[in-house]
Each structure stands twice: as structure tokens, then as C-alpha cells.
């Protein structure tokens, strides 16, 4: 069942539409089995061996699909035959070769205060987290990361049963609570005392509510940082830092995406810049990356292409899922990742991961 609801920021209006549909699992599975490799081929040079290995594998499978009588027993037998052919003749023989690794971390960025009221923020986080929990029931490999204890506090106050389910997923290791700060705070204007208290209250909440000692400062949507931050982080028991936007300079681009950031007192924290982006089109500037990524082949390829420290590491990161106003990953994201995890010819392979695992591996590589 699908519920579509739209409200306009410019006028008092609301539109609601409901649809009830039946998902054909067999056909849906074949759709993704064919679509994701085909999208991967579109990212490759048509003269490359990888391009033709993908197309040959798809052609063999498609030729087995009997379209003369859709949804008949013969049709479903042919669908299964096509999927078996793909697994045995393409995935097992042409995929999974030695390739870079892209960690895929489920994530939804929620601005606590931006283009909506705090009351709407409370609703956004409940809807987003509920979607995560329902998808976890359908996809046992799914892992999700979310920062900002303020959001968890909203859920605890307004949806205690939802909060109880989150606690259970945290215990199972499928829901990652990280980020260190109470909010993903601005780091230009606040005083040092303010930043210290962001971390104090953030880490205390995570420890008391989830039994988690946060070690990563997670600020994907913040626009600048105090040079005193490494010292503050180190003294707070935080030794890793992830961010995005400071790498967006058009002319004076920082030549590093993974490095040790040394503060004014000599304190150091391992720092990682997100490199998630689609492959740029011809003539398109390679400036922006995203923290609201997808697992599409174009983004898997573009994320690896953008990463600058290939001489040290063969791993990088996509945080996938709708964000800013919440929304989180979708079923489409997870189905797509299951196919990019094959290690499609010419592309990096992917795996569902956590922020902690990625940061630890990246730091170890350096």
C-alpha cells in the first residue's frame, strides 16, 4: 500500500492519494537483476571489456524470458530460468573480481531547525525512523546510522513504542548511534564552551540510553570548523571526524579526502570527507558531493572516482538515503545495493556497512 501526501509551502492546500498494489516478487527480482547491471554498463566505455561482459551476461538471461503469455506458469518458469542464468553465468563468472570497496551506510540527515517548525521536525523523525524499522524487517542485511540525540529524545517523548524498537535494533548491532554532539552543530560561531557542552550532553545521552561511547564527530551538513576542534575532540574522547561541505571549493580544492587534522595545540583527529556523487557528465564541474546518496551504479562509480587517496586506500563511503527533511533509505536503495554488491565488471563492489567500520578501516589504511 502506498500513501502519497503533499502540502504546499505557498498556499493552504493538501493533496492525498492512496494506492493498493500487489508486488510480484519474481518479476521484481528479475527487474533489479537486469536493471542494475544495465545501469552499470551505461557508466562504462563502450569499447571496454567490462561493458561487453555485462551486455553478454544480460543478453543470455533475457533470451530465456518467455513473453508470449505473461504471468502464466510458463512465464514464471522462464523468469526463474533467467535469474538462475544470471547467477551462474554472469555473477559467478564475471563479477566479484578484485575491485575497490564502497561502504554503503544507511542514513537520513534531519535538520532540526530549517524550513519547518520544530513540531514538524518531531513528525519527520518519527516517520523516518519508522520506515527504517519496517525495512529492517524485510532486509536482514540492512544497517542504519543516525546522529543527534535531540532527535532520539523527540521519539522517546512522542512515540515510546517506536523508541523501544530502536533500542532493540541498537542491541542487535543493526542501528548505529554515533555523532558525539547533541546536535550537528555549527562550528564557526559557537564558543569553545558551547562545543564542549554539545559533546558532553551528546555523549552522555548515547551512553545512558544506548550504552554507546561515541568516537566519531559526524557533521555532514556543516559549513566550517574552528581550528580548536581537534583539541576539544581529543579531550572529549572523540578521535574521528566525518564531514562533507568543506571539500566543495570550486577553485582552492583541498587535495585530501582522508587525513590527520592537526589543531592549533598539536592534537590530531582522523578526518574523512564524503566523496559520494554521480559520475560527472562531460563538461560538468566536479565540485559537489552528497550525504544523501544512492546505491546506483553511477554513484558507486562516481564516489570512487572522486576519492583522492587511492594510493593509500581502496575503500570509500556512500551514505545513502533521503535527507535534510528526513526520509531515509528506500526499498529501491536496498534492492540496488544487493546487485552492486556483486562487484559488477568495471565498478567498485559495495557492502552494507557502518560508519564506525568504515572510519576504522580508512584510518588503518593511512
Name every feature range the model reports, one short phrase each.
Residues 1-366:
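Catalytic-domain carbohydrate-binding cleft regions of carbohydrate-active enzymes
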Amino acid at each position: 500500500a502506498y500513501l502519497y501526501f503533499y502540502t504546499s509551502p505557498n498556499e493552504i492546500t493538501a493533496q492525498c492519494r492512496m494506492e493498493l498494489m500487489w508486488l510480484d516478487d519474481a518479476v521484481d527480482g528479475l527487474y533489479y537483476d537486469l536493471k542494475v547491471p544495465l545501469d552499470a554498463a551505461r557508466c562504462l566505455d563502450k569499447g571496454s571489456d567490462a561493458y561487453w561482459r555485462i551486455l553478454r551476461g544480460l543478453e543470455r538471461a533475457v533470451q530465456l524470458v518467455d513473453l508470449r503469455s505473461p504471468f502464466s506458469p510458463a512465464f514464471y518458469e522462464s523468469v526463474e530460468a533467467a535469474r538462475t542464468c544470471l547467477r551462474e553465468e554472469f555473477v559467478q563468472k564475471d563479477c566479484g573480481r578484485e575491485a575497490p570497496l564502497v561502504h554503503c551506510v544507511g542514513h537520513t540527515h534531519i535538520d532540526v531547525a530549517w524550513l519547518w517548525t520544530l513540531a514538524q521536525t518531531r513528525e519527520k523523525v518519527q516517520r523516518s525512523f519508522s520506515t527504517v524499522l519496517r525495512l529492517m524487517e524485510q532486509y536482514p542485511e540492512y544497517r542504519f546510522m543516525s546522529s543527534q540525540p535531540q532527535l532520539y529524545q523527540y521519539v522517546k517523548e512522542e512515540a515510546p513504542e517506536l523508541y523501544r524498537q530502536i533500542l532493540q535494533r541498537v542491541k542487535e548491532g543493526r542501528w548505529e548511534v554515533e555523532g558525539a554532539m547533541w546536535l550537528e552543530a555549527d562550528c564557526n560561531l559557537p564558543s569553545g564552551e558551547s562545543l564542549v557542552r554539545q559533546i558532553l550532553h551528546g555523549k552522555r545521552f548515547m551512553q545512558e540510553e544506548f550504552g554507546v561511547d561515541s568516537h566519531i564527530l559526524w557533521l555532514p551538513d556543516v559549513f566550517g570548523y574552528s581550528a580548536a576542534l581537534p583539541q576539544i575532540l581529543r579531550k572529549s574522547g572523540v578521535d574521528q571526524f566525518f564531514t562533507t561541505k568543506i571539500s566543495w571549493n570550486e577553485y582552492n580544492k583541498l587535495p585530501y579526502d582522508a587525513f590527520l587534522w592537526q589543531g592549533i595545540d598539536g592534537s590530531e583527529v582522523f578526518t574523512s570527507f564524503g566523496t559520494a556523487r554521480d559520475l560527472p557528465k562531460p563538461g560538468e564541474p566536479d565540485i559537489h558531493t552528497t550525504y544523501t546518496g544512492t546505491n546506483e551504479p553511477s554513484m558507486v562509480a562516481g564516489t570512487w572516482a572522486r576519492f583522492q587517496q587511492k594510493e593509500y586506500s581502496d575503500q570509500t563511503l556512500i551514505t545513502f538515503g533521503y535527507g535534510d527533511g528526513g526520509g531515509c533509505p528506500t526499498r529501491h536503495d536496498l534492492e540496488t545495493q544487493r546487485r552492486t554488491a556483486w562487484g559488477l565488471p568495471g565498478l567498485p563492489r559495495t557492502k552494507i556497512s557502518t560508519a564506525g567500520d568504515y572510519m576504522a578501516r580508512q584510518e588503518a589504511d593511512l
